[in-house]
Structures are given as structure tokens and as C-alpha cells.
């Protein structure tokens, strides 16, 4: 909300920040009143709000998470998922798809395994259709995963009672582990999901959709294992 942005800006200034940067991604890009929202944010926090494009968001996440060399990046957000391929600082390709965890959950809530399997297949078709350019690259990069779905998966895999994204930095997840969590979560009730160590209660409804997106992406891009990163577009923006 506008008030939340104002509070964050005020807190940053109270902590001594000399310059405040504010940028908006998928939710504001898609909102009918996105421009009105950013204008109100600018008025309350006293700094310009930049609405970044989907491709720009993909590049920012890559810059934030890449550690150099040939790198593929998957950033699963609420409204969209970004894919980027690069070598060091050179971007080979970047794309943003309209299939975030919140968006996919709104289209088809995952209440049983059949819902999960259908979501995986839907996401695979979307990737085949909208990320053809990236799928055509023959490079074999190290893959890195960014966003709440990734770090939540890491926290659940390690059974960390109090979720902290930084504790998952550098952790790796393979495809069987991702697919296994997808199957287990899909078969759980909402109450059971809320009891899983590492899964914050407010993510209990959307996390299976995020995992379905990740499984679909790993299968389409031929990813057997990826490294988790707590860094993403905010880090990339500051760089």
C-alpha cells in the first residue's frame, strides 16, 4: 500500500539513508491504477517511483543473484516469473512470463495432486510458447533460483522453524526434491501446510503453485540442480 511505502521510506531516512530508490514490478505493471498508485507513493515518500518492465526485472534479478560465469536465473514472484541467461555481465536473453505464484493460485488453487500436475503442465506450455528464444540456447549454465518460492523450499528442506532467507543462501535443490515437495504439499490440507517447518503461514495457499512453476521451468530448461539465492532484483537495482 501507499502507506507501507511511506513507512519504509521514513524508516530508511531515520536510519541515515541519504538517497531512497523505489521501483515497482509485476503488480503495479498490471494494475489499472498503477500510475495513480506510483504518483501517490511519490507524494508520500518524496522520491520518484520507477515501474520496471518485465525484461528489466529479469535483468535486475540476474545482476543481483549471479556470481559470474555462465548463469541461468529463475525468479518466481507473485505475478510473474523471470528467466535470464547470461555470461558474467553479458545478458544473452531475458523474458518475463505472466505466471507468478499468486496469479497461478488464483487461476487454479492447488487442493489435490491433480491440480498440481495440471498447473505444472500449464506452466510448461507457457514456457514453450513464451520463452522459445531462451530455450533455443545451447549453453549449459549454472542455474540460480531467486524469490520467496525458492527460499521457502530451502527452509522447508532444512526444516528451519523460523524462516530466514539468508540461511538458504548458496543451498542447492535438485529436480527430484522440488517435484517431491510439490507432490507432498498438494496432498496436504491448508492446516497441514501451516505446520510445515520453514513454511510461513501466509504462504500456505500459494507455495504449491510456486513449486509447480519451478518444476515446470526445471523440466523445460533441462535443469537438474539449482543454487538458491536470497539476492534478487533489489540487489541488482542497487548495483
Label the predicted regions:
Residues 1-19, 25-70, 85-239:
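Helical "lid/coupling" subdomains associated with nucleotide-phosphate turnover
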Residues 75:
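Conserved catalytic-loop position in the HRD/HxD motif
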Residues 79-85:
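Acidic, divalent-metal-coordinating active-site segment for phosphoryl/phosphodiester hydrolysis
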